[in-house]
């Protein structure tokens, strides 16, 4: 059985990046929540 995590910078950015978050209402809520908590990094 292969490992489930096969790292790829491109896929990481597309799925969890700032622009991916910004594109949906839920994603914007995630960013807002992370800003409210004072997170240094908002997204991948």
From Swiss-Prot:
PROSITE patterns: RIBOSOMAL_L34. InterPro entries: Ribosomal_bL34, Ribosomal_bL34_CS. One of its GO terms (biological process) is translation. It holds the Pfam family Ribosomal_L34. Residues 1-44 are annotated as: Disordered. Gene3D superfamilies: 1.10.287.3980. It comes from the Bacteria. The keyword Ribonucleoprotein applies. One of its GO terms (cellular component) is ribonucleoprotein complex. The keyword Ribosomal protein applies. Residues 10-19, 31-44 have a biased composition (Basic residues). One of its GO terms (molecular function) is structural constituent of ribosome. Keywords: Ribonucleoprotein, Ribosomal protein. Belongs to the bacterial ribosomal protein bL34 family. This is Large ribosomal subunit protein bL34. It comes from Afipia carboxidovorans (strain ATCC 49405 / DSM 1227 / KCTC 32145 / OM5). The gene is rpmH.
């Amino acid at each position: 059985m292969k490992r489930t995590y096969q790292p790829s910078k491109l896929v990481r950015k597309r799925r969890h990046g700032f622009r991916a978050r910004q594109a949906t209402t839920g994603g914007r809520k995630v960013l807002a929540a992370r800003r409210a908590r004072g997170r240094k990094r908002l997204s991948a």
